[in-house]
Amino acid sequence: MEKFQAAMVLGAVGDALGSRWQTCSSGSQIQQELRALGGLAALKLDAEHWPLSDGALMHMTTAEALITDYWCLEDLYRELVRLYVEAMVSLQGRVPEPSTVEGCANLKPHNFLLAWHTPFNEKGSGHGAATKAMCIGMRYWQPERLHTLVEVSIEAGRMTHNHPIGFLGSLCTALFASFAVQGRPLVSWGRELLKTLPKAEEYCRKTIRHMAEYQETWFYFEAKWQFYLEERGIEDGQSKPSFPERYDADETDRMYKRWSSEGCAGRRGHDAPMIAYDALLAAGSDWEELCRRAILHGGESSATGLISGCLFGLLHGLSAAPTGLHQDLDRREKLQDLGERLYRAAALEK
C-alpha cells in the first residue's frame, strides 16, 4: 500500500516541479536556476508556490472514478465522463492541455448510451491521456487483468484524446504502472508494450467504426517506440541499455527533441512516456538523477515529471525523495488517500 501512496504523491511532486519551469526551453538554464535555489533538497513544495497542474488533477480525477463501486465497465465510463466534465470547472485558472479541453467538450454526461463516444480528433495526440492513466495500471495491475487494463486505458484515453498517439500513450503508462507493481524487469517494459499493441488494435477494431483513419498514426506510435528501443539496444527486452557517454542537459534536450514529433519534447502521447521510461532506466533508485533527466529539461516537464514520479514511487517508494518535496505538497492527504483506496480496490476482484 505504501508504494501506491508513494506513486500518487511522487507523481504530483514531479508534476509540481516540472510546472515551475514549463515555459523554459533550456534544461541547462533550469538546472542552473535550481542550483541557485539550493538544489532539490532545499526546496519546500506547497500549494501556494508549487501548485499542481491540470495533468495531476486529471490523474486524481481518473483515480476517483476507479475507486467507485461500479457494476460494469460501462458504469465506470459514465462516471469518468461525469468527473472529467466536472473537472473542467476546477481547472479554471490553470492552463489545461488543449486536447483535454476539446475532448471534454465532446463528452455527454447526460446521454446514457453515448456519454463517452467522441469523434476522431486530428489534434488529440497530446500527452494528456498518458498523464492521467498510471492509476489505471495500479487498479488493474495483475497479469490476468491485462484485457481490462487495455480496454479501460484506451476508453479513458479516447474520452479526451481520440487519436492513436494520444490514447496509446494512455495504454503505455497504464501498462508500465502495472509492470512496476508486478516487479517486472524495467528493461523489458518497452518490448512488452510493443507485444501488447496487437491486443489493443484487436480491441479497437471491434469498437471503432472507422478504424482506417486511425491506422497511419497508429503505426507512427509503434515505429517511434521501436526506434527508441533499438537506439538504447533493448529491443530484446533484456540487454543493458546503452546511453551516450556525454549526457548533459544540452545533450538531453537535443535527444528528447529528436524523439518528439514537432520539436517540443514530451508534448505527445508517444514521447512523454518515452522520456519518463528513459529516465527511469538511467536513474535506477536515484531520485535526484531521475529529476535531472525526466523533469529538469526544456520540454513538457510537468507531463514527464508526473509519469516518471508516479512510476518511481511504485518501484522505489517515498523514502528516496527529500521530505521537503512532499511534506506540505498541494493535496497531499487526498493523494495518499487515493493511493490507499486504489490499493484496496485492486485487491477486490470485480
Curated annotation (Swiss-Prot):
Report the InterPro entries cross-referenced here.
ADP-ribosylarg_hydro, ADP-ribosylglycohydrolase, Ribosyl_crysJ1, Ribosyl_crysJ1_sf
Can the keyword Cytoplasm be found in this entry's annotation? Answer: yes
Name the Pfam families on file.
ADP_ribosyl_GH (PF03747)
| GO process annotations (BP) | cardiac chamber ballooning; cardiac myofibril assembly; protein de-ADP-ribosylation
Keywords from UniProt, A to Z, are: Cytoplasm
Q: An example Gene Ontology cellular component term from the record? A: sarcomere
Q: Which domain of life does the UniProt lineage start with?
A: Eukaryota
Q: Name one GO molecular function term.
A: ADP-ribosylarginine hydrolase activity
Tell me, in a sentence or two, what this protein's role is.
Required for myofibril assembly and outgrowth of the cardiac chambers in the developing heart. Appears to be catalytically inactive, showing no activity against O-acetyl-ADP-ribose.
| Family recorded in the similarity comment | Belongs to the ADP-ribosylglycohydrolase family.
This one is known as Inactive ADP-ribosyltransferase arh2
Taxonomic lineage from the root: Eukaryota, Metazoa, Chordata, Craniata, Vertebrata
The gene designation is adprhl1
